[in-house]
Design a protein with these regions (language model features):
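Short, Lys/Arg-enriched, disordered terminal segments
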Residues: 1-4, 58-60
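Short aromatic-glycine-(Arg/Gly/Cys) micro-motifs in beta-strand/loop hairpins
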Residues: 3-33
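A short, charged, amphipathic alpha-helix used as a generic interaction element across diverse proteins
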Residues: 24-60
């Protein structure tokens, strides 16, 4: 585990999930919706990738 905190968030305008360091994440961004907070980078990266795969599957 890392000392850094991460957030996975959904960006409605571009219809995609992203991750960022929690301190840089702007909670007031109109189109960004947080979905997961963690200090486990591997979990954050895996969650973002799997959520984006599901979005692609739903769009077909």
């Amino acid at each position: 585990m890392s000392d850094k905190k991460y957030v996975v968030y959904y960006h409605e305008k571009v219809n995609e999930y992203f991750y960022d360091y929690y301190p840089r994440f702007n909670m007031n961004e109109q189109y960004s919706k947080p979905v997961l907070y963690s200090d486990d980078f591997e979990l954050i990266e895996r969650a973002k990738n799997e959520l984006n795969e599901r979005l692609q599957e739903q769009s077909y």
